[in-house]
Amino acid sequence: GINTLKKVIQGLHEVIKLVSNHA
């Protein structure tokens, strides 16, 4: 549902933050 989608999006944002910090 929508809650699961929100969790997935939050996870993607966390990954992007980590990648940006390493880059």
From Swiss-Prot:
The keyword Cell inner membrane does not apply. Transmembrane segments: none annotated. GO terms for cellular component: extracellular region. InterPro entries: Antimicrobial_19. It is found in: Secreted. Pfam families: Antimicrobial19. Expressed by the skin glands. Keywords: Amphibian defense peptide, Antibiotic, Antimicrobial, Fungicide, Immunity, Innate immunity, Secreted. One of its GO terms (biological process) is killing of cells of another organism. Belongs to the frog skin active peptide (FSAP) family. Pseudin subfamily. Possesses antifungal activity against C.albicans and is also active against E.coli and S.aureus. This is Pseudin-4. It comes from Pseudis paradoxa.
